[in-house]
A protein has these predicted regions:
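A charge-rich, low-complexity, intrinsically flexible signal that marks solvent-exposed coils, linkers
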Residues: 1-75
Length: 75
């Protein structure tokens, strides 16, 4: 996993890893979730990948659009 940039500070996301149609996020509490083409869907995954690479807006996007619609809790 690579560290999430968190350019504005205060994000709950600390790290991410992504592939062609998925992204895995680790949060400050250690919880790790996988999001994919099934949950929450390809459009959301693509946007989450874009925001993760940019290092800003990911936590806000999750709270506003994705919430608990993840594919799996990994840790």
């Amino acid at each position: 996993m690579q560290a999430y940039g968190n350019t504005r500070g205060g994000s709950g996301v600390v790290a991410y890893e992504s592939g062609p149609d998925w992204i895995v996020l680790r949060f400050v509490d250690g919880a790790t979730y996988r999001y994919d083409a099934r949950h929450p869907g390809p459009w959301h995954v693509a946007e989450m990948q874009r925001l993760a690479a940019a290092g800003r807006g990911l936590s806000t996007y999750l709270n506003q659009h994705v919430r608990d619609d993840y594919a799996a809790r990994l840790a």
